[in-house]
Regions:
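Phosphate-binding P-loop
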Residues: 30-38
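Short amphipathic alpha-helical heptad-repeat segments
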Residues: 247-263, 279
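N-terminal pre-Walker A segment at the start of P-loop NTPase domains
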Residues: 1-29
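Phosphate-binding/switch loop-helix module in NTP-utilizing enzymes
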Residues: 101-166
């Protein structure tokens, strides 16, 4: 590759036109107010932090507020039944074009062909799971599979597809026990931003960029799930001590994720999302009977 001048490149002005969510999230993400095309954001959080719920809500908002844009959700782990359960908490999921990889024999070909259709914003859940499915269905090893996924994203980020669409990506990735990004450090260098989701009190969470090429970093934006959508707040709400008998106090989605992780760790059992939710509902019912 030889040196180039920006004026000699044919970069469309559309890459500077943000896709808005019409929420406080827009100014938090970029100085232009919204998610920009041709960006790759890694969304990092621990088990039960609400990464998937937040990302689905965000993609749904982008789709609703930008009707001419095409949005795609790549579900690497959860199948249609799992997501139907999740949609009872995040109704926007019902309207999203979703590519399911569970049980697919050739996910590599399916992902390639689907992305070639040209999408403005793609949510991938998750980088680890998708690259793992590539590894188990091809001759590529773990490192090569991860590189294949990253290379494919950057290909579409640069508009190298039949529709010349400069795709933006939200890519979920698990955090380590210490709360940091789990993966190759080169990913952090190459991407547009690293967005961390951290838990607060009850249903509250906050977002914080450790790196953001398109906006500010090390600034917190608080939010909570309320009536099927994320509600954003500039400051964390004051926690008021309850005057009535407490409930379990953990959001159902987060609790289900914890149950699933515990079953895997202690009993080496892989629960489906539906099984995890069923256990949570039974525990909640039992708890309510005990505190009557």
């Amino acid at each position: 590759m030889k040196p180039v001048r920006l004026k000699d490149l044919h970069i469309p002005k559309q890459v500077l036109q943000p896709m808005k969510t019409n929420s406080e999230l827009d100014q938090f993400v970029s100085t232009r107010g919204g998610f920009l095309p041709s960006t790759v954001y890694i969304v990092v959080g621990g088990a039960g932090s609400g990464k998937t719920s937040w990302a689905i809500d965000t993609l749904s908002r982008i789709q609703d507020n930008n009707p001419t844009k095409k949005c795609l959700y790549i579900s690497g782990e959860q199948d249609e039944i799992d997501n139907y359960e999740l949609s009872t908490f995040i109704p926007g999921l019902l309207e999203l074009d979703t590519l399911y990889l569970s049980g697919v024999k050739n996910p590599q070909k399916l992902i390639e062909e689907t992305l070639d259709q040209g999408w403005d914003m793609v949510l991938m859940d998750s980088l680890e799971v998708v690259s793992g499915r590539i590894q188990t269905t091809t001759d590529l090893n773990s490192k090569q599979s991860l590189k294949w996924v990253m290379d494919l994203m950057f290909k579409h980020k640069r508009g190298n597809n039949p529709t010349n669409t400069y795709t933006g990506f939200l890519v979920i990735q698990q955090a380590t026990k210490s709360g940091t990004f789990k993966g190759d450090s080169s990913i952090e260098f190459d991407t547009s931003g690293m967005l961390y989701i951290r838990r607060g009190h009850g249903t509250e969470r906050h977002l914080e960029f450790s790196k953001n090429r398109r906006g500010e970093s090390n600034v917190k934006l608080f939010y909570k799930l309320e009536d099927g959508q994320m509600v954003y707040m500039k400051e964390e709400e004051e926690v008021v001590e309850p005057t009535v008998k407490p409930t379990i106090g953990i959001p159902t989605i987060a609790f289900a994720s914890l149950i699933k992780a515990l079953a895997k760790k202690r009993f080496d059992t892989n629960l489906t999302q539906k099984e995890s939710f069923t256990i949570v509902k039974e525990l909640e019912a039992t708890y309510k009977d005990l505190v009557k």
